[in-house]
């Protein structure tokens, strides 16, 4: 090392959004650890309250502020760091850092960029500069021309020749990018593409239809030494965003010449941008010959590098941080192996498969086709010793109700070959399920290749699974050898039992009798070729012996959160990591079972033992058989653990904390409602939907609107408010499809009520609780609501009643551990709507707001009891904390933005303040694309709900300095109106600074809302929130920028 900075500022990525997720919690946490090892003081700016890194143990100073240049400048001014790390917070961090550089902030305060410099970042992320840099270095790129206007794009597309790929500079998740087959396609979408570029630039590139896409991950130090860490092969061809693609590592279809040529190009790309640290390089390969092009590079930690790190066992983020400090590769020890230096390139004796997870069914009008823009909200990673085993495991990990590639709902559906091929041509999510269906219905390899462009190598493997499964179906009994082969091909007990028309218990019994059990294998980055010490494992049937001996003692298995989806995100990983740390005081050994490559919990130095494998009853029982775990904890990882808790208990597994039977009562809407009646606790009127006659009778008694609520679901899946009979019957039909095993509950929807929650822990007798109040009225899903601590509008009387209700439930259900209760409060009377006997989505926020870790307290409650004398205790608040949702509307092509009882947000941000409005505005500004409107600009304010709030919002915005229009079809008293057509024109012309609306008005204002989000215009979808934010605008000059401890928060 040449020099060691005394204080380093690390820029986080802010709230989770599509294409920028928990991988930056993992990479940022590793960077902070690497800095701490050097004795360097660390300062972190990140508004993502749900992350592990925004805990005090990672950074010396934590600022929960918007990740924008002017807020970061305030931190630099106060903290005076001498170095800044910008490669661990995604595209958000890079954009902010380029702004800080261009505005002279870094130079003014003498802050040195550590790692790849700004000019290298601009060479990589400006499509024009990247193209020029590649050509200067004789590196192959596709025919292309850049453009900064609609006219230039149309002109250059004619030169390049259709079809063209439109790539967007300084951009996240391919937002705004597209394939244009004709000039008409280009004209229709180019304005949106330019709007989504941070610098207003696009690249018009020749579209390489059905070419293979590959990625290489490379490390490079200051001396130019390089190590290529991984080669990742996309199964989806060019034209599908790599974040949307199913991928495998190592590459399966390259010959040595192809592999080595692209490896050499990768090192040359890193050299051309003077990389210091890590980057990924993406290639297009012609499947019909030795022709390849370099597509792009990301000079930072990325989603791919997180995957590569977990796939290989090579700690990319940690090593990258060390290289940024000036170390050379040979000077850094790979802490996963504990034996080798960072210049050793990993060797794999297994196959990793990554599959994205989509939640598109939650969004109306969304384009379901996979394309150049990323729409998936999470991903899973499986490890196996054959492609078939790895792929089938990954399909189960998706938790979409499919038992593997074959044998599930799609495989057994009434669907012809023609229909299956049509779905494949449309590039629907989870295409491998439709490939299997097409083969089952008689399609050939060539027919499927023609519509998909997927390598025949992979198609043959999937066809082999179909053929094997169809053979299984004609057997009456299964012999030992066939069963062994089925397990090696990745078939679950459930799949095998379905094929044989037997029970899963029957299959498990035969396996036990024949000693057909999985073996535990280590991931050591070296394929066992070098002695190593590692705690990173997976299970496979393609092996004969375990790679380790199992210890005895008091051991705990923690079930992780699995792949992220709407409603399950990084907040549950925070709970898992918190539980790991808290449980280590009570157990000899704590192991984690999880399969999400993005997370901190699946990192090499967090868990004593990490099993990177499936989360289901079969796998947990396999692990208990080997490890003899005394307890299994299912309460920290969200819904996936709760959904298997009861079955685990029925199989003799001891659950840590609250019993599976109590969880079942809380999760089953009908059982829970009956319990509330028994305890005399108020709830909205309800009925179990066992027949349409009962539903009609109930609705005649209580009247519309009513809420349709399925059981055992997360994030309000298929939860809808029905205002008419037609809507009601449609929602009931959907709910029974989502949760067919359980009854649907219809309840009276209480209008104009306050929604509030209690996050807490109990020892079965006493409760530690934290009250959260929603800004939006009841009816907006809690995951999409803006939350305040302490409460503002609730009366003390209402809160005391809520506390009494919570205490009654805790004692009746013998709650031991964490829980969350949701209320609607009308006329000072609280009505319970939901109880979750697990860690909640809001628990990181409530814990950090009050300065008390609820998961730590949960462990105390379980083992020692809560250590206070009161029956119910709520810690005091020193200042204000507000949590805001992050939506990803712009990524979800075509969807209609609106709020309701089904969750739509992908992440959350929080901030602290000396007043409610101080905390609210910083929290709201932390979610993209929210910003302070430019004065003298235009705002649109309209809607059919919360009209008084909308009118007051308009008044506040006028005071702030905006010209405010309502819409003549939905006028607000005293506010100037324009017609809908004029409003649409203003939005398209980018003259509107913000849109505030309320209600479900799709037939009326679809174009206004959709165009606004496509053009990065802030949209507020609730009148009450609009009022509070507009009021906060008026106090913009009094925002505070303190470190979290000064607000009395943080843990």
Curated annotation (Swiss-Prot):
Per UniProt, where does Mn(2+) 1 bind? 282, 296
Query: Which region ranges are annotated with the description Allosteric domain?
Result: 931-1051
Q: Where is this region: Carbamoyl phosphate synthetic domain?
A: 549-930
Q: Name one Pfam family in it.
A: CPSase_L_D3
* Annotated segments matching region Carboxyphosphate synthetic domain: 1-399
> Which residues participate in ATP 2 binding?
709, 748, 750, 755, 779-782, 822, 834
Cofactor descriptive note: Binds 4 Mg(2+) or Mn(2+) ions per subunit.
- Specify the protein name: Carbamoyl phosphate synthase large chain
Organism lineage: Archaea, Thermoproteota, Thermoprotei, Sulfolobales, Sulfolobaceae
